[in-house]
Amino acid sequence: MAGHDDEEARIETVKDAVTDMKLERQSSTESVAPNGILDTITPKDEPNGHLSSKPSTPSLKPPKSRSRSSNSLAKDEVPEEKVGGDITIKQEPGQPPKLARSASQKLPPRAAPLFTDLPDKTTEATSTFQLMEVCTYANKYLGYTEHAMDCDCAEEWDAATCRNTACGEDSDCINRATKMECFGDCGCGDSCQNQRFQRREYAKVSVIKTEKKGYGLRADCDLRPNEFIFEYIGEVINEPQFRRRMIQYDEEGIKHFYFMSLNKGEFVDATKKGNLGRFCNHSCNPNCYVDKWVVGEKLRMGIFAERYIKAGEELVFNYNVDRYGADPQPCYCGEPNCTGFIGGKTQTERATKLSHATIEALGIDDPDGWDTAVARRPRKKKAGEDDEEYVDSLQPKSLDENGVTKVMAALMQCKEKWIAVKLLGRIQRCEDERVRHRVVRMHGYQILNSQLNTWKDDFNVVLQILDILDKFPRLTRNKIIDSKIEGTVSPLQECDDERVAEKAKALLEIWSALEVGYRIPRMKRDPAAVNNTPTANHYERRETAKDDRKPNSSKSRSRSRSRSRSVDVTRNAPRGPAALTRGGGKGHMHSYRPGQRPFRRPFNPLPKGWFAAESNGRTYYYSATGETTWSRPTAPAVQPPPPPKRESKEKTLQDIIDGIMNAKENTPKAKDKSATPATPADAKIPEKKEHKEKWRSYSEEKQKKLYENTLFPHVKYIVDKFKHKLPKDDLKRYAKEVAKKLVNSDFKNNRVEDPTKISDKQVKQVKKYCKEYFDKAVAKHRAYEEKKAERKSKGSVKATTSATIDKAETTSTKAPPQFDGAAETGDEDSDVQLSDAEYEDGQEESSHHSGLKRKRTDDEDFENDHENGGVSPTKRQRSASLPIIPPPPPPMSPSNLVLDDGSREALKRQRTEGAEDDEYGDSTISSGKRQRSETPPPPPPPPPPADIPPENIESENENDKDQEELQDYDVQEANWGKEDNIAIQSPSHSPFPAQSISNHSNTARETDSHS
């Protein structure tokens, strides 16, 4: 007890000696920490003057003995005062008091005080500001950082706790090691342990009222080291706004502000809006630290436990502040190593202070050695001097595997060039291949890609990064592609610095030679369909009964973790099969309800293409082609031919339209059937009275379009006559040109009374003009072909001129010269001169001998179509293309139960004939659908093997065959006169009815006339 009393007396003496000292005021300019990591915070709104600052990592531990310093200042130069026991205070003019470096013993640690007796002031404290759950950003670019990367962890579900233990504190999660939260579709699954910021997994804390420090934060439960306590939330602002608010709050009488430095030039202001994290006080011996984490695309700040914290302890961290102004703020932490003031020196006079994590990443052996080495320099730091000069004399230790995590985490958040250079230098000097593999695994390519984009204007830093990339172990291109670093290195090939250009070019050549390793693609999860409740599934992994009987066993607990979600332990899994093995009997089977059993292949299945059906209790077998048999087949069935490829809807519709137009034009007039059929007059469709004059409300452009559509059938009538004389593309172009000329001329001369119809006289004039137009085009085309043939004949010595011309006319594929209708008939704006003379079709047909035969054949076909039911041209073409199928052979002998090859072929032809008859009678699609179905409908069973005598069956089959041949012969004889251009194999082999044969022959004649 006496020793304890002496210790308390000693601490009180130190506290009194520190607080009674007077420091000379010194003026200093306001500035921001140049390194962007040290945080500037101003005091809190309580008389304690405690600051709310933002250190970026764990605060410093209690300093070790500094008696090892060999360059300590002489004692006679600096006055010292012994305030109690072995503790000595050193005082310098104008400087805050500090412990003497000559102390030979470490300060004795003290037990952390508990504040369990203080009442909860959370409600009272939250009334002084606006409570927020997330940070607000002045603009969307504030707090932005590189997107979080995917980790390599897999799901690990613990059945006992029903939690996903992946990415935990003790795991080797890459994201957790580099201070990134798993975000989106990481492979670790839903609700992993590395989503604390997103799920707001705050510790149980409460606000208390302290004696001297005002409001403080108290832990209501025990906390483990590195446990997440609270996120520091407020308004994220930029530096100009920060400076304006400093002045604004001072004018409003707010003496204590809550600013935390989030990034270089970015601050979190929790003065008026924030959460309970703003009440965490300062201490020179803290139990918490502040760290920055990447969450999605934002950088966020959280408070974490630095050591084991008991319930009732006050949560404090080292503000590590750079003071703005000359007035030092007193510190009331009461720790043995307390310097008495928060921040100490002003911004321009301070010594270099870095976060604990940054010091470890730089390779400094002892965090205290950093401050000691800086303080022992023979001169003070000058205003505006870079911190880099203070660390040049320090030799960092070599990088090992354990230090890679700290280096990559610090490099990920580094915004200061001199710190980035030091960290990159540690990686560059490393020669251990295992360490380099570790760097690559810790998102090495992604982090170096970010640094390369940040410092691409500094060629020295770029060379340093390229040298590190060149030393990386390379097996595949996967990580290089995922990091997208090739897009950053590629522009460096055009760099002004030759060293950078050569290095970048060589690196890209090496990368391009690597192969891409195949990886199983990760399943993309739908964020909206996330369900955190484990559900029972018949195929999921179940826990064994042994694990259920030993819930407290560590061995069974370790086995209960699996890669996938396990069955909910609160539900009773079916135990039917297990009950039978234990002698449960039928009683246990009553509650066993298995799920749907998997499909099992039937025993001794039929060969491919065969199916079974029943008839009168007997089983027979059939194939898709119609082959049937009573005996079980042993060989695969002959597969039916694939269904014909269906035409597209657009082509089918166009064929229907063309068929209607051809039938309309080929319709002869009733008054002169004997004469050569003239061009059909325009079909007058009766319209409703109210729609008769609707076209008058249209614009002139729309009326022209309507009139052009009216002329189109008559222009097409002439175009069809020239389709074998001109190339298709030229024919279409000329048709459009002549239609435009006719429309413009008629509208210019006011010859259009109604754009929806034209008179018979106009029809003849239009056709005459179109014929003259295309005759000139044909003449031009032939002249062009002749000239081309002459040029070919000159180049060929052996070929004759006549042979060259014939060959050019038949095999030429070049486009003919552009036919300028305006050059022959006048300008486009000039009127089209239409004569009143009637256009005689006989003149045209006399000049084209083959056209007369085709026209007469078309008229006959049209009449036959109307007499026989109006079969469209499309159907006629389909009929012509189908092969003629011979009739089926007589049925097989019932005495032969096993079909031979001839019988099978006969049944196949018989079945195919039935399908063709259905197709021509109904639709061409039905048979295709039957062929595509998996199991076709069973055909009628084959004749019974023994019920009917064979003699009767053979006689009936012969009579049926004779009758079918007689009917087919009658049909063939009735249409014999029309089939002059196509040969039919045999009357008895024709499966087509009379109508189909007639259409078939007409189509053949039409094809022959065209040729």
From Swiss-Prot:
Recorded GO CC terms: chromosome; nucleus
The EC number(s) this enzyme carries: 2.1.1.359
Biased composition (Polar residues): 798-815, 983-1002
Region span, Disordered: 1-118, 527-604, 630-650, 665-697, 782-1011
Domain WW: 604-635
Coiled coil: none
Keywords for this protein: Chromosome, Methyltransferase, Nucleus, Repressor, S-adenosyl-L-methionine, Transcription, Transcription regulation, Transferase
Transmembrane intervals: none
Molecular function via GO: histone H3K36 trimethyltransferase activity
Biased composition (Acidic residues): 825-844, 953-971
Record has Transcription regulation as a keyword: yes
Glycoprotein among keywords: no
InterPro entries: AWS_dom, Post-SET_dom, Set2_fungi, SET2_Histone-Lys_MeTrsfase, SET_dom, SET_dom_sf, SETD2/Set2_SET, SRI
Cysteine disulfide links: none
Lineage top rank: taxon: Eukaryota
Protein name: Histone-lysine N-methyltransferase, H3 lysine-36 specific
